[in-house]
């Protein structure tokens, strides 16, 4: 009796707890689904609660109707869609082999599927009929693990028969990755012309040079012996030659081809490609599908900068973050070594390095500008700025590049210059209302924004916007903190102001606060602060993430090799692969690099156009790097 009273008392617990804990909790088991499967398998093994018999090739297989209906659309429609099979104890299954049906039922009860060369085809046929995507994917993956040049056409036919787009894409990828070797086989010439045309048009075609594409196009129609012996007719060029991007071929190769061709459409095409090479200054304005790199590898890239330790070898090396390895690699030597804080812009996948600090025997403002072409690993010196600009910012708006303010180490500047790649010339546009240097800028929605910087000895928190349509500057709301030698990035409809330093504490300190400006609300806010100081950082945006590269930390009293990556969705910073050296003043951007580069050793010295002999001799006499306290920041 006493026990019953105690239990009754427990049942009277208040449903209004006196503390602030949640009234309800939801619990989720991570083991329940597997336990349920094990229980169903035990029922099957024991022959308990079967309620349907599948008749396949005249043989009977007992099963549980509810599990079949839950496993795929085919059985769900059969047993829960109002069909006559809902009431039948025996159901006839057509077009599926008994062995394949056993395989599929084993998967339904266990989530395991054993495939072999002897059963994969009939299992795939059954999975397609019964509409079980997971098994279809497993079969396709298994087939791909056995694909070679001898059986690839058979697998293509299987993919076409069952409309397996994923398998077709995997087969295409196999050929794209092994194109040079595969193009020398008989199976290559048995592919449909439309398929080969599509493959040769792809940016994912893995070749070391465009000449291999040209040869591959010929090998579809001619044998290797005929191609090597030049026993081919190009008066009426094969259609596949339309896919060859002749401007990507080396000029010497094009010239040899041009010289041996008679009057023909192909000769005209080659002549146009030669003109592309000869008009080097105008190449950015001559871009089209046939000048596009065969690559979809967008990489964070850095140029120049100052190292904390003497290094004449690394000072002129550009570096990129290899997305396959997750580490930094060197890929080209710069035409202008020992430069830092250069303005950087990317237009039509050409990199422009504008002005900046010439770090030879001290610091001086630079007016010279360079352009890098990753298609041919080639540098070209473009028209110089009309005046020297150090500690400037550079932005692309539309088809123009803008170099904004800065200083020449005699005066602070307000001048703004605009570069037109079509004419290789600079012209002045509307200047800023006041001088500024060590500011940062970026482009959003067709307008250019600059923030903060210095004027004389004062740190600023100003924000200005340039409208190229009206050639006017507008002043916007001040940012939340003064800073200079920082970076900016545009992401979605917001501007981010990152890093830098100020002397609000009475001495130079890092600014960790990251400010965010909404162009919609025209309001400033703060987001997750930087985990470390980044003055004079490189800034790049890739896949909606902001990369902050190296820089100077005044709190630590040193340059850094840190890389921090901002995730806007999570509002957090992650550590990225560190730079190989502590470096500040790195000019960073995002660039599409050749696919072959990611799989090979660093390139050697690039081709150089309009090399400056005086500048080269000047570099040859350079002593070690300046120490940390001898920097453009003062």
Swiss-Prot record:
Q: In which pathway does it act?
A: Protein modification; protein ubiquitination
Instruction: State its location(s).
Output: Cytoplasm, Cytosol; Cytoplasm, Cytoskeleton, Microtubule organizing center, Centrosome; Cytoplasm, Cytoskeleton, Spindle; Nucleus
Please list the residue ranges that the record marks as compositionally biased, kind Acidic residues: 624-634
One Gene Ontology MF term:
14-3-3 protein binding
Q: Which residues carry this modification: N-acetylalanine?
A: 2
Q: Sorted alphabetically, which keywords does the UniProt record give? A: Acetylation, Cell cycle, Cell division, Cytoplasm, Cytoskeleton, Kelch repeat, Lysosome, Mitosis, Nucleus, Phosphoprotein, Repeat, Ubl conjugation pathway
The record, for CDD domains, names: BACK_KLHL22
GO CC, alphabetical: centrosome; Cul3-RING ubiquitin ligase complex; cytoplasm; cytosol; lysosome; mitotic spindle; nucleus; polar microtubule
| A biological process term (GO) from this entry | positive regulation of TORC1 signaling
Q: Which residues carry this modification: Phosphotyrosine?
A: 466
* InterPro entries (alphabetical): BACK, BTB-kelch_protein, BTB/POZ_dom, Kelch-typ_b-propeller, Kelch_1, KLHL22_BACK, SKP1/BTB/POZ_sf
Give the domain of life.
Eukaryota
Question: What is the protein's given name?
Answer: Kelch-like protein 22
Q: Which organism is it from?
A: Rattus norvegicus
